[in-house]
């Protein structure tokens, strides 16, 4: 192996790309001439990674959506597989996205490439049979939730808890007054965050019920809706249509006053300054827990996806904050329980009662403590392990 290692990176989702984009410069600090290729988003490409496959071309959610797009996803997977066989990378770093990455791990293993997996597949929740692939094809597993370390070690996988990268992200510096001025919000009112997800399908499934809940919570609050930068213009247009319909329905009913929903770009600032938020299950719930302000978790998928998930998911909670705490810290409204009336029931105390807010914030502080690790950052720990694996490969190459 030369001093310019050839590194395969695979990150198929927004959170994975965030971590991948942090790893590229960290590895370049050790290997200035390192070459990166694989699956990733625009940020990773901007940092010099050659994208064999674009993350936006393979990122889908839900079992039914995966099935519908399977031919296209398989075609993109074959591109990645061919690139691995042709280039024989010195190291592979696979980030989350198990439906693709566990298959790539086999190809990499067969090519003799060391495999480092960062952000574990949630095999502890479902599809535990896939642990066999991890045992066979993954050399090191680096996990971001503390209970995952024991799970993998119990199955004979070399696994280490490195802390959650989001614990290292500082709180937004923008003040409440500045945020209010920037978005024409009333600082005298309570603000409620609406976070329906970062994908078009999530917004279609989640936002209408959130809007209905806002109507019931009332116009005496401000509602803040951050939209992910990855949404297409068509998806943003769909959001505008939903908000326009809300205003039109209020005009039709003269006695009604529509809640004011303001679209913004900064989800973290929204979570930081909102009195409480309604958050779709996903990485945003981890961000919300770490920021520490109260929230309610909601989750909805297609009926078929949910029917299958009910049979195979074995964990007692959906919200990661509750899994980490091993108790109910935040409310969960799943599938049929995800209704406007139920949201209002859970949100009203968080908006109106300081005591209810403080009780939840105490639980969220415990979650944050469990996700943190003393010393170096999660990205620094991953970089260190990657460096050790490259050094070991170089030493073996010299022996041969």
Curated annotation (Swiss-Prot):
Pathway(s) annotated for this protein in UniProt? Bacterial outer membrane biogenesis; LPS lipid A biosynthesis
| Keyword Cell membrane appears in the UniProt entry | no
Check the record and name the Pfam families matching this protein.
LpxB
A GO MF label: phospholipid binding
Q: Which GO terms describe its biological process?
A: lipid A biosynthetic process
> What general EC class does the enzyme of this chain belong to?
transferase
What's its catalytic activity? a lipid X + a UDP-2-N,3-O-bis[(3R)-3-hydroxyacyl]-alpha-D-glucosamine = a lipid A disaccharide + UDP + H(+)
Task: Specify the domain of life of the species encoding this protein.
Answer: Bacteria
Keywords, A to Z, come to: Glycosyltransferase, Lipid A biosynthesis, Lipid biosynthesis, Lipid metabolism, Transferase
- UniProt xrefs under InterPro entries: Glyco_trans_19
From the UniProt annotation, give the residues forming the signal peptide.
none
What the entry lists under SUPFAM superfamilies is as follows: UDP-Glycosyltransferase/glycogen phosphorylase (SSF53756)
Cellular component per GO? membrane
User: EC number(s)?
Assistant: 2.4.1.182
The record's comment on protein family reads: Belongs to the LpxB family.
Q: What function does this protein fulfil? A: Condensation of UDP-2,3-diacylglucosamine and 2,3-diacylglucosamine-1-phosphate to form lipid A disaccharide, a precursor of lipid A, a phosphorylated glycolipid that anchors the lipopolysaccharide to the outer membrane of the cell.
Check the record and name the PANTHER family matching this protein.
Answer: LIPID-A-DISACCHARIDE SYNTHASE, LIPID-A-DISACCHARIDE SYNTHASE, MITOCHONDRIAL-RELATED
Q: What is this protein called?
A: Lipid-A-disaccharide synthase
| Species assigned in the record | Acidobacterium capsulatum (strain ATCC 51196 / DSM 11244 / BCRC 80197 / JCM 7670 / NBRC 15755 / NCIMB 13165 / 161)
